Amino acid sequence: MQIEKVETFPLFYHLEEPYGDANGLKAYRSLFLIRLVTHAGIVGWGECKGWLPQLETQFQQWVIPFLRGKHVMEEARWLPLLQQESAALAAGVSMALTEIKATCAGLSLVDWWGGCRHEQIPVYASFQSYSGRIDWMERSIERVESAFDAGFRQFKVKVGGRTFCEDKKHIRALQERLCEAGEVALDANQSYDVGTALKWNEVFSDQCHWMWFEEPLPIQQVDGYRLLRQHALLPIAGGERLPTTASFLPLLQEGALDIIQPDLLHLGGVESFRQSLYLGRHFGTRITPHTYDGPLSRLYALCAQSTLPAWSKMQGDGIEPIEWDWMENSLNQLISLMPEGGQVPIPQGTGIGVEWDEERLTYLRWDGRSFTP
């Protein structure tokens, strides 16, 4: 079964109002999709992370010629060559190959992987809390309230992009508005040192409705994470940008994290991603994959999560939640999969089991012009 055709879909969406995290504000959202078609007409979709002009150039100049004629069932022979050049490109191709093989077998993704242990997966609403507005705190809280009204009861908000005192004011105001009706995780995007991160214990000690403290330190500081975990009042999470399954080993062996957050798009392929999930399970660590970038990688994370054994025997708390981007983002509507009451049912159809919105794909296609409005 050979790859006959490769199509690219660079997608671009200008935001009505810039938003962001500790790394700065975003004026747009982008997504790079690929579609592989075999000589038998079987289709597989993939998603790549990166800068649209660079990704499009790479595919047109050498990735498409490299892929044409390759045997899908010989992936183990040739995909490592692509992984050596670019984990981002290989991740997208790996997703497309997985869908093709599952479709060829007449199976859903989860059945291709051995079957579903959880028919639905909890999701938490993920936010980019900062904006250029003077009243950014109120705007952030309003977004969380909109997610609450939509059925979410778990939320992740950003810290680390303002002073500690300003961020603390924001989080206290958010907790007052939620009135303990929802759980909150804080994501610092690797902004702090150990001393500053521990200052958050003052806030964490006020209430018990917390989930975790995400990447408070640069992820390479294993000793710092181990020290922080010994003294922090919340579980410590991290690892979204780690490039290989082996990269998680120092953090796991040193007991530096309570929760690992593998990201398929950084790990260079579906199997590396799933291996990272099971590695975490073998170490007795909770797992909540990072899935901020696009709807297809999030779908793969949901399906992979559904195949994991439960982390806990506590009824109703057996499987960890997946991130669901709740910001303004038209890219989220590209596939027919949405949460209901903070849960997402796992698709059971052949392949990825969802339909693409072809009109939206056409509407959002990047026209090659500048990214500025």
Predicted regions and their residues:
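Metal-dependent enolase-superfamily TIM-barrel catalytic cores that perform enediolate-based chemistry
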Residues: 112-232
